Amino acid sequence: QRQLLEHWSSYDNVYLAKVSDYSLVPFMATADLLMSDASSAIIEFAALDKPVLWCNFLKLRWNYRGIFSYRFKKRMDKDYNEYSKIAVRSDSYKMLKNNVQDQIANPKALSEKRLHYANKMAGTLDGNASKRIIDYLLENK
């Protein structure tokens, strides 16, 4: 997997984020789509109403596979399957490649579902969340 990621990062239009790049926000603002494994980033990116690709072909750590798969299921949010509907699932690299092309050509294909689940998770998506927090804090000193 590492070799494949390093190969992709050699392209001029690809930036492979390092572990030290812990904040995804700057990348989300400029990205056309998100490719992710099972991550909360899927939900966060959906709020931007941009295509999300779920890479389901990456190998989990050994202690989450086989007879230990219950650990992974226990760790994941109980509602995760419901929210997986906002992403296009890719079970192989070949499928991912096709899905990237399709989602770039049709970025609004899952727009309604993305916005539905983003509103369910984050509430009103009008850009005024900070203002509402400040107003609440000022009113409830």
List each language-model region with its residue ranges.
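Nucleotide-activated sugar donor-binding and catalytic core shared by glycosyltransferases
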Residues: Q1-K141
